[in-house]
Amino acid sequence: MPNASWTVRRDRLVSLAALGVAPAGGPRLVRAVEGARRARLPRRALVELGLMLRLYAGYPAAIEFLRAVARTWPARTAARRHASYEDWQRWQRDGERLCRRVYGNGYDRLRAFMSSLDPDLDEWMILEGYGKTLTRGGLTVAERELATVSALAALGWSRQLGAHLEGAVRVGAPLAHVERARRTGERCRWTSRP
């Protein structure tokens, strides 16, 4: 049973997701990261959030977010080993599993649609998006979906937002949390997309 109380951690994560996708986050983003640190959010949770912002707002957003984390909370990063064939297989399997969990009965339709746009886009969605990024540790699946809702609302991507509003509930986020994440993102909206 998911925790029904809205936590400081969730509040900070959805606010940071909305701020993190804005192209001019700058000092405001740094202050928000400082606040998250004071609120005792783990640094890893912020790094994970920064990495996943690449999926919604591209590498510039991820770079600037992680730059704010590094400025506020310096740390050494560990060297990474090269991915093995088994890693790629696991990312594919875990990505398919998580995507199916988020999209529920709409999973097969989503995959067919993405393939119709371009088979590479479908593969990248599963492997890079769901497998390599969203199945990592540091954040729960529900926290990742709430951050996704906030980021998509801030960016104004209504189609994708609708799917992830439902997906967040499917992975265990209470509806009240999903609505709060959406409202947080909408308050931070920086674009005029319809």
PLM segments and residue spans:
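Acidic, glycine/proline-rich low-complexity segments that act as flexible tails and inter-domain linkers
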Residues: 1-12, 21-39, 44-48, 54-141, ...
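Contiguous, well-ordered alpha-helical segments that form the cores/surfaces of helical PPI scaffolds
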Residues: 12-22, 145-155, 183
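Intrinsically disordered, low-complexity segments enriched in Gly and acidic/Ser/Thr residues
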Residues: 159-160
